[in-house]
């Protein structure tokens, strides 16, 4: 577990950010989505991102509960985060806690409730345009270039010799796979006969 001193000394970067307990839940979805779409990261809730003043989270239970629901209610699909509480002394000298939200890098593309896609770049959550979002889908394997329509293509663009070669490779591979299954069945039958002797 990190200490409060380590949190305060750490600069905001691609994998770390501080947020006030007063942050709007919809606004908190943005860095969660952005980190999940990038390398993952951690959010420290209860530390002002502008002044780095320790506000803490105690005494703000209603807002805290709203923020804890953000990964489920405002992220699509939901982001599976891990939360921990770090004891601290707030700026008024009272015992308090901050909330650390650990966000794993995801193999899926995540958006906020407005279907906007963000990615963490440096210490900012960058909103992706359509092309950047499509590229992220390809990078995460949720979309394949083979599925992309090529609107101006005609049958003349297809190299039938390559198609024929491909079909031969596929049919040979399928034949070999069927042959292996037949051989395995024969071996299993021989083994069963031998074990019954």
Kindly give the residue locations of the regions a language model identified.
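Conserved N-terminal catalytic/coupling substructures associated with nucleotide/phosphate chemistry
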Residues: 1-197
């Amino acid at each position: 577990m990190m200490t409060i001193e380590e949190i305060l000394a750490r600069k905001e970067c691609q994998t770390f950010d501080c947020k006030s307990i007063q942050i709007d839940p919809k606004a908190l979805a943005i860095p969660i989505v952005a980190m999940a779409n990038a390398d993952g990261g951690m959010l420290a809730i209860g530390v002002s991102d502008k002044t780095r003043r320790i506000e803490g989270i105690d005494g703000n239970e209603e807002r805290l509960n709203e923020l804890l629901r953000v990964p489920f209610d405002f992220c699509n699909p939901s982001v599976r985060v891990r939360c921990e509480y770090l004891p601290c002394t707030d700026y008024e000298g009272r015992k308090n806690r901050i909330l650390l939200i650990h966000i794993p890098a995801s193999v899926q593309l995540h958006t906020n409730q407005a279907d906007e896609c963000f990615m963490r770049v440096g210490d900012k959550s960058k909103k992706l345009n359509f092309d950047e979002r499509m590229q992220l889908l390809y990078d995460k394997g949720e979309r394949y270039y083979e599925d992309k329509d090529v609107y101006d293509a005609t049958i003349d663009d297809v190299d039938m010799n390559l198609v024929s070669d491909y079909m031969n490779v596929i049919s040979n591979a399928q034949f070999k796979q069927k042959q292996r299954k037949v051989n395995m069945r024969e071996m299993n039958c021989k083994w069963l006969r031998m074990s019954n002797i």
